[in-house]
C-alpha cells in the first residue's frame, strides 16, 4: 500500500487544476496566475474522497454583500483544510462555515469537473 502525505495530495490537486476543472460559469476568469480560482467545490469533494471528514460551506462577501460560496474540508478533531483560500483578493472575505452533507451518487452540479479532477489526482497519486 502506498502512503501519501497531505503534501502529496495537495501537490496532486494543485497540479491538476485547470480551466476545465473550475466552475463553468466562471471559466472565463480562471488563469494560471490564480489556479485556485473557482476550484473550491471540486477540490473539497476530491479531498473528501481521499480523507473523509466533512464538507464546509461559507459565504464570500464583498463590501458586506454575498457574491459567492466557498467550500473546504473539516477533518477529525475539527482540523480544517482549505487548499483554495488563496484564490480570493483582499476585497473578498469568507464568512461563516456550515457543514453540508455530501449528496449521494452523482453531484447535482460540477459532476464533469469533479470527475476530471478526481481522475487527474488519482493518476498523479498512482491510483489511476
Tell where the protein language model's regions lie, with residue ranges.
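A structural boundary/capping signal
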Residues: 1-128
Amino acid at each position: 500500500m502506498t502512503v501519501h502525505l497531505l503534501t502529496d495530495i495537495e501537490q496532486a490537486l494543485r497540479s491538476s487544476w485547470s480551466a476545465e476543472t473550475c466552475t463553468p460559469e466562471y471559466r472565463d476568469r480562471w488563469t494560471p496566475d490564480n489556479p485556485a480560482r473557482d476550484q473550491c467545490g471540486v477540490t473539497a469533494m476530491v479531498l473528501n474522497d481521499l480523507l473523509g471528514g466533512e464538507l464546509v460551506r461559507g459565504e464570500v462577501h464583498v463590501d458586506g454583500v454575498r457574491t459567492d460560496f466557498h467550500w473546504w474540508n473539516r477533518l477529525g478533531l475539527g482540523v480544517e483544510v482549505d487548499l483554495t483560500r488563496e484564490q480570493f483578493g483582499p476585497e473578498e472575505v469568507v464568512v461563516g462555515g456550515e457543514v453540508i452533507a455530501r449528496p449521494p451518487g452523482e453531484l447535482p452540479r460540477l459532476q464533469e469537473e469533479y470527475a476530471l479532477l478526481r481522475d487527474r489526482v488519482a493518476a498523479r497519486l498512482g491510483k489511476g
